[in-house]
């Protein structure tokens, strides 16, 4: 009968272990005294920053979502301290990621509050952007982005 209590104690010790060791109670964003650091750099030439496990954005790059440029962003999930990417807070709980783009950790949306005064006056050099669109082309692109975002979200829903 002595092995039964010993086995019970071993099972109890194993079952009360903490399996996720790098996250505090409440998640990694609940660190009260930890300074917020800049998120991992990503994208071509590491000129962007991770906004989520599949999102990499930069001022000059725009945003990459679910592309090979975002593979490094998965590492952010395993780091114990919280990070903050981007500029000022914007819609849907996100932060300004690129001119006119607001990203949270799982999605990006077009947001005019992320346009600074200089971005309207700033000229884009041909090396930075090979195409300039008129209003109707940019409206079409915006609609396509919204459709792709809705399709991506519907893939992750379970019925």
Curated annotation (Swiss-Prot):
Modified sites of kind Glycine amide: 26
GO CC annotation terms, alphabetical: extracellular space; secretory granule
Keyword Disulfide bond among UniProt keywords: yes
Presence of the UniProt keyword Secreted in the record: yes
Post-translational events: Seven disulfide bonds are present in neurophysin.
SMART domains to which the protein is assigned, alphabetical: NH
Source taxon at top rank: Eukaryota
Primary localization class, coarse: secreted
Residues carrying sugar: 129
Cited function: Vasotocin is an antidiuretic hormone.
Protein name from the UniProt record: Vasotocin-neurophysin VT
Species: Bufo japonicus
């Amino acid at each position: 009968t002595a092995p039964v209590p010993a086995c019970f104690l071993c099972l109890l010790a194993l079952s009360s272990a903490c399996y996720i060791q790098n996250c505090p109670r409440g998640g990694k964003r609940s660190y009260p005294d930890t300074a917020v650091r800049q998120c991992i750099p990503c994208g071509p030439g590491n000129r962007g920053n991770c906004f989520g496990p599949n999102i990499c954005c930069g001022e000059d790059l725009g945003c990459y979502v679910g592309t090979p440029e975002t593979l490094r962003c998965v590492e952010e999930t395993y780091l114990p301290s919280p990070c903050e990417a981007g500029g000022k807070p914007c819609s849907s709980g996100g932060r300004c990621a690129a001119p006119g783009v607001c990203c949270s950790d799982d999605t990006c949306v077009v947001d005019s509050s992320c346009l600074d005064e200089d971005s309207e006056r700033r000229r884009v050099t041909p090396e930075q952007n090979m195409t300039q669109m008129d209003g109707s082309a940019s409206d079409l692109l915006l609609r396509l982005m919204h459709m792709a975002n809705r399709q991506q979200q519907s893939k992750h829903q379970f019925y």
